């Protein structure tokens, strides 16, 4: 196994993450599964001197109104990227991350399908556009490739300048 891309995520809207059930569900998908899957494929990745790319979110670096579990789980994913980058390096495995900004996905439909909300979101992004799957793929390919052979434990922010 050369590359393992971990790109799972869920969110609970309408303040559901403030309840135990919503919190636990989001944490299980967005954070716990990252560790479990990384551990499961560690030996295979080590045999190939492979690479893991953990997709988190810009929400892991800033507050996310109404979604505390989502923000905390993505912050945890960023920290896990650092920790696994250090822990797995001796096995020849590089672990890096990707923190997307606004990309049109199932999880962002609440914004992308509301013209007023979308306009407000785009106004905060210096490039004045959403990211695309191709934008994210390019960054992931770089992190997984030999071009990033001396990079581990780092999360690359790909957000059109939103975090500036």
How would you label these PLM feature ranges?
Residues 97, 116-151, 160:
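C-terminal helical subdomain
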Residues 14-27, 121:
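Substrate-binding pocket helix/loop in short-chain dehydrogenase/reductase
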Residues 38, 73, 81:
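Active-site helix of classical SDR
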Residues 49, 89, 94, 151-153:
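Short, small/polar-rich loop/turn modules that mediate ligand/substrate recognition or access, typified
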Residues 62-68, 90-91, 128-129, 146:
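Active-site loop immediately N-terminal to the catalytic Tyr-X3-Lys motif
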Residues 57:
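Residue(s) in the substrate-gating loop at a strand-loop-helix junction
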Residues 43, 86-90, 149:
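Alpha-helical segment proximal to the catalytic Tyr-Lys
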């Amino acid at each position: 196994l050369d590359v393992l891309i971990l790109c799972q995520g869920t969110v609970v809207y309408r303040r559901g993450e403030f309840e135990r059930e919503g919190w636990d569900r989001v944490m299980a998908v967005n954070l716990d599964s990252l560790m479990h899957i990384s551990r499961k494929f560690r030996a295979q990745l080590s045999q190939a001197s492979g690479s893991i790319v953990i997709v988190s979110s810009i929400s892991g670096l800033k507050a996310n109104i109404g979604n505390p579990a989502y923000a905390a789980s993505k912050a945890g994913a960023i920290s896990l990227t650092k920790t696994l980058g250090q822990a797995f390096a001796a096995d020849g495995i590089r672990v890096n991350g990707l923190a997307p900004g606004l990309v049109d996905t199932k999880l962002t439909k609440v914004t992308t399908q509301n013209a007023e909300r979308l306009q407000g979101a785009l106004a905060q992004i210096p490039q004045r556009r959403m990211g695309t799957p191709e934008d994210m793929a390019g960054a992931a390919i770089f992190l997984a490739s030999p071009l990033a052979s001396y990079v581990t434990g780092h999360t690359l922010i790909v957000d059109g300048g939103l975090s500036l």
